Curated annotation (Swiss-Prot):
GO terms for cellular component: plasma membrane. It catalyses: Na(+)(in) + 2 H(+)(out) = Na(+)(out) + 2 H(+)(in). Belongs to the NhaA Na(+)/H(+) (TC 2.A.33) antiporter family. The gene is nhaA2. It is a multi-pass membrane protein. This is Na(+)/H(+) antiporter NhaA 2. It is found in: Cell membrane. It comes from Salinispora tropica (strain ATCC BAA-916 / DSM 44818 / JCM 13857 / NBRC 105044 / CNB-440). The keyword Chaperone does not apply. PANTHER family: NA(+)_H(+) ANTIPORTER NHAA, SODIUM ION/PROTON ANTIPORTER NHAA-RELATED. Keywords: Antiport, Cell membrane, Ion transport, Membrane, Sodium, Sodium transport, Transmembrane, Transmembrane helix, Transport.
């Protein structure tokens, strides 16, 4: 997939600069900053004297009409660029299931269950709040159920540099599974008119794509047309086109071609993820935020009107209350009712902070919001304001909570390390330990000894 880059001499200035830029874009803080910048620019532009230019840009139509792909730029961002984002998310998901933490169900049980709780609880909170509103308000039940991987990991990268590595693994597993559920929700509940013929025809380019990869054919001139054809057929079927990104990702081999290959040799999946992640973080997600986050607030009165809409209240409550409630409650139940491993340097303070990070919906929530309510309507604008507000509140609360173990850890008197049997919870990893484990943590991970005979 990086054939053009391989054509450059290894020591060339262009290649060095390209590699440097790509490395910067792979950093989680960079992706989150670009995402936030796109959203801020959209909000400022939509509320400036040049707001008409923003609307004109979003509605500008481009694409081949004979393929029914004459779409607005906003639609291209939603259906096209987000497919790249979901392709990367699908690669991460498959990597975790095949070679990562999810390959062992016992280790993955807690974050997977937490993800399910983090979908059900905010949806339930939203439904409870909007049940008395108009009937169409319930169409947005899935908006607060999503987690923005890029934004959440970026916030964690900034505030959690002194946290155990297991914290990031737990969040990544939770967010990836959360996005998988969101993709299934989009495919099942937000497909209005299903065309069976193009949907069945999707199998042809998808299978060809998979066969080429199995044979280690990585020519961009062969793979890209097949990927674009798969995307176009999914789009024509009525299923949201982002699903194509996940389908393509799931057929990418996650293991080295031969068992005799050196264990350090990257798989095709790792190579694809390495090559395409900068495109997702540096282009796809920020441009989608630019195209989708802009909403005319209308001053203080407009803001009050938006935030008093039952739908907006339901979205904010779902993200800020429902998400943490679902994640924490299900995590507690699973760790108490099953024999999941304890220890791994995670405390309930960590879980509480991570549950707030999961409340950063943003990208996927904006997508579901556009699928739930017609663009340009007052309710759709209220949903946008609610998503931005709820995500920011969740991010701030997460930052405050996750700074607590940092301060406590620096003093060496974090109460959660004193009684590991009561405060530690299972996570998706058993591989990471703190650089300087406390005696309590060390004892908690030692097998029980039988009395000497």
């Amino acid at each position: 997939m990086d054939a053009t880059r391989r054509d450059l001499p290894p020591g060339s200035v262009v290649r060095r600069r390209t590699d440097r830029i790509a490395d910067v874009l792979r950093a989680e803080t960079t992706g989150g900053a670009l995402l936030l910048a796109g959203a801020v620019i959209a909000l400022i532009w939509a509320n400036s004297p040049g707001a008409a230019g923003y609307d004109a840009m979003r509605s500008f139509t481009v694409g081949p009409a004979w393929l029914h792909l004459d779409l607005s730029l906003a639609a291209w961002a939603k259906d096209g660029l987000l497919a790249v984002f979901f392709f990367v998310a699908g690669l991460e998901l498959k990597r975790e299931f095949v070679t990562g933490e999810l390959r062992q169900p016992r280790r993955a049980a807690v974050p997977i269950a937490a993800a399910v709780g983090g979908v059900l609880a905010p949806a339930a909170v939203y439904v409870l709040i909007t049940a008395a509103a108009e009937a169409d308000a319930l169409r947005g039940w899935a908006i607060p159920a999503a987690t923005d991987i890029a934004f959440a990991l970026a916030v964690l990268a900034v505030i959690g540099r002194h946290l155990p590595p297991a914290v990031r693994v737990f969040l990544l597993t939770l967010a990836v599974v959360d996005d998988l559920i969101a993709i299934m929700i989009i495919a099942v509940f937000y497909t209005a008119n299903l065309s069976v013929t193009p949907l069945l025809a999707t199998a042809l380019p998808l299978v060809a794509f998979a066969i080429l990869l199995r044979r280690r054919v990585t020519s961009v001139w062969l793979l890209l047309p097949l990927a674009l054809t798969t995307w176009a057929l999914v789009h024509a079927s009525g299923v949201h086109a982002t699903v194509a990104g996940v389908l393509l990702a799931l057929v990418v081999p996650a293991r080295p071609h031969s068992q005799h290959e050196h264990t350090a040799a990257p798989s095709l999946l790792e190579r694809f993820e390495h090559a395409i992640k900068p495109v997702s973080a540096g282009l796809a997600v920020p441009v989608f935020a630019l195209m989708s986050a802009g909403v005319a607030i209308g001053g203080l009165g407009g803001l009050v009107s938006a935030l008093t809409d039952p739908v907006a209240i339901g979205v904010i409550a779902g993200l800020v209350i429902g998400k943490p409630l679902g994640v924490i409650a299900v995590t507690w139940l699973v760790t108490r009712l099953t024999r999941t491993g304890l220890g791994n340097n995670l405390t309930w303070t960590h879980i509480t902070g991570l549950s707030m990070l999961a409340g950063i919906g943003f990208t996927v929530s904006l997508l579901i919001g556009e699928l739930s309510f017609a663009a340009g309507t007052e309710r759709h604008d209220h949903v946008k304001i609610a998503i931005v507000t709820g995500s920011l509140i969740a991010a701030v609360l997460a930052a405050v909570i996750l700074r607590l173990p940092n301060r406590a850890g620096s003093r060496g008197n974090d109460a959660t390390t004193r009684d590991p049997d009561q405060t530690r919870v299972g996570t998706a990893t058993q591989r990471t330990t703190p650089d300087h484990p406390t005696p309590a943590a060390t004892d908690a991970n030692q097998p029980a000894r039988s009395p000497a005979p």
